Each structure stands twice: as C-alpha cells, then as structure tokens.
Swiss-Prot record:
A lipid is attached at residue 210 (S-palmitoyl cysteine). It comes from Felis catus (Cat). GO terms for cellular component: external side of plasma membrane. This is T-cell surface glycoprotein CD8 alpha chain. Residues 1-21 form the signal peptide. The keyword Hydrolase does not apply.
C-alpha cells in the first residue's frame, strides 16, 4: 500500500500532467480497453516510449467511483518487483517483459477489480502518466417493455351521464335496434315530460279547490214584495 504522502501527491501529479498528455503519448498500451468476465485472466501491457525514462514502471488503479484516488498496485524494474502489501500474488502479479515493456496480470477477474488501470514512469525528474485502460464487465442490455395499449374504462352506473339529448348513446354491450325503446336514452326524454304533466295537474287541482272555497252562495228563495203602503203583509214577512 502506498504511503499517505504518496496517496495525496498522486492526484496532484495527475492534474499537473494533464497539459502534457495533450501531446504525443509517451506510452503504448495494449489493449486500450478490456471487457472482462468473472474468473477470466486479464493481462495489460505498458510500453514506455521515453528514451530518457528511468528504469522501472509503476502500475496504478483507480475505481469508477466519485472522488476515487489512484491506488498503488506494483512497481516493476530490472532488479525487483514490488507489489502492494495487501495484494495476493496469486490474484495480481506483474513482470518486466523487455527493457521498456511491462505487464500486469489479473489472474481471476473479480467484480471489485472493475475500474481504470494505468502506468507511470519518471524521466528527467518529471512524473509521466499513461492514459487510462478501462476494465469492466459486459454491460447487461436493458430491455424496454413494450407500451401497453390504452384500455377503455368500463361504463358503470355510478358514472355521471350527460342529460343532453345529443350525448345520449346506447349503453355498453347493448345492440342498436331499428325499433323498440332503449330505456337508457328514452328515460331522459320521458322523465322531464312526465314531471311537467304532474306539475300542471297539481296546479289545476289547487286552482279548482281554491275557487270552490271562495265561491259565493246564492239564495234561491224569492224576495218579499213591497206593496203600495210600504209594508209587507203578514203572510209575506217570512219566506
């Protein structure tokens, strides 16, 4: 494992080297991208093209996570090979193949080893970093479900029905016949008509009753006849 000072300086060195990375790369990486599989053997190679580079190459790893920092994996030189303390040599190993060609091998690729691998060298007191080599598992294809056809809500008796004649339609599931009554439509025509007739009949009954009570009674008895003397006869006083 790298020291705390190295862990802090590596991100700064990567930023300072960003301008130089725009020019010709001093490294040749193979392969440039890996789509690994669980348990598969993955081998990465880094060839240093700088003639003035110091002997030795460092392999680094960075996870695909926010605020991830480079992690030291191995240092390879002509005289020695040094792995990070927590690494298992049976899982990750490195070697110097030629004078300027170095390799890093993941013997059994695991999910936690997904990320970016790169190498670095020192030349004339300048630290150079290679481009990232992404190593990831295959992306599972996402199947988009087919859109469901729109379904029409069934008509129920609880739904409000417009009383306008123009919107009167046959009920769901019923067949339209040339003759006969369709109660789902005719009821909205006969109900107002029956209500109007009932109102008129009730008004007529009330009018008849009121006129019968207020009618003046007419006396059918003959009135007494007044004679010339001005007094009616005793027999004519009473009717």
């Amino acid at each position: 494992m790298a020291s705390p000072v190295t862990a802090q300086l590596l991100p700064l060195a990567l930023l300072l080297h960003a301008a130089a990375a725009a020019g010709p790369s001093p490294f040749r990486l193979s392969p440039v991208r890996v789509e690994g599989r669980l348990g598969q053997r993955v081998e990465l190679q880094c060839e240093v093209l700088l003639s003035s580079a110091a002997p030795g190459c460092t392999w680094l790893f960075q996870k695909n996570e926010p605020a991830a920092r480079p992690i030291f994996l191995a240092y390879l030189s002509r005289s020695r090979t040094k792995l990070a303390e927590e690494l298992d040599p049976k899982q990750i190993s490195g070697q110097r193949i030629q004078d300027t060609l170095y390799s890093l091998t993941l013997h059994r690729f695991r999910k936690e080893e997904e990320g970016y691998y790169f190498c670095s060298v020192v030349s004339n007191s300048v630290l150079y970093f290679s481009a990232f080599v992404p190593v990831f598992l295959p992306v599972k294809p996402t199947t988009t479900p087919a859109p469901r056809p729109p379904t029409q809500a069934p008509i129920t008796t609880s739904q409000r029905v417009s009383l306008r004649p123009g919107t009167c339609q046959p009920s769901a599931g019923s067949t339209v016949e040339a003759s006969g009554l369709d109660l789902s439509c005719d009821i909205y025509i006969w109900a107002p008509l029956a209500g109007t007739c009932a109102f008129l009949l009730l008004s007529l009954v009330i009018t008849v009753i009121c006129n019968h009570r207020n009618r003046r009674r007419v006396c059918k008895c003959p009135r007494p006849v007044v004679r010339a003397g001005g007094k009616p006869s005793p027999s004519e006083r009473y009717v």
